[in-house]
Amino acid sequence: MALLAPESLGNANRAGRDGRRGTGELSRGALGVAMNLPTISLLLLVLAYPVVYAGYLSLHRVGIAQLRRGDFPWNNGDNYARLLEDPLFALALKNTILFTLLVVGVEVVLAIAIALLLNQASLWTSRLARLLILIPYGVPPITNGLIWSFMYSFQFGFLNRVLFSSGLINEPVNWAGNPDTALYAVAVAYIWRTLPFAVLIVHAALQGIPRELHEAATVDGASAWQRFRSITLPLLMPVIIVILILRTSFAFAVFEEILAITQGGPGDASYVAAWYSYKLTFSPPNNIGMGAASAYVLALLVGLFAIAYVRLLYRRIA
């Protein structure tokens, strides 16, 4: 009878343990998927149906008359062709991109600066500041727009009173009613509401950077700017990319502040893509199909920005 060498027995035992471990890990993975399947299915149902249905509407001629009859004629992509030929849509896209670049750029810079200050503050001061910073984030967007609309009021606005009493202006400024300042006025209101999210995320990321790295760089004679550029900023890049993606997607869809402060005006100065889709869909003649097409184009642009951000992140990692 053949006998197995001790090495062969050891290898067989290890193979058996590895096989059982692999089977156990597979079983745990399958169990995790099975337990999350109801939630995933519900999310797909809630999210996928509106997306697919909007895509269906964007390829058909849909108005009030068609809704009443329940008959949506196929229009061979005419909604998209008319959309791309509409100069108002081009203007809305230009305003949206300008608004997004302004809002996201300012928000990221301010978030990093404020988070760095909080990181240097005492524990009690940092906690109090974070609590106060969270207040604007809890304000509903439409309420935030109404608050800033009152602040921008030409005759009774708080902003004009403060600037006039401090001697910075000689007469009231119509912030929301001037074509040169309307979009920027909305941007300020939007940043005030959304900045806290970015600040808290960046501050949490700063807490995870080992102090030993900064201490070693200080010993080597690195200045504060060199430490920030070589240590802090590279380690913050993954978080910054996440903020860029989230804030870009939300800024592209800005609507409530536009509705409350300018309603797309004066003229077309603050006419953004979400407002364009809203007016197409809910204002006579209620071109619902073309409104859905504009929403799809907007989603495509957001996706392109997200891809660019992710490519930037991978390039930084490489």
Q: What is the predicted function of each stretch?
A:
Residues 28-318:
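A structural signal for multi-pass alpha-helical bundles of membrane permease subunits
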Residues 1-26:
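Short, Lys/Arg-rich, polar N-terminal cytosolic tail immediately upstream
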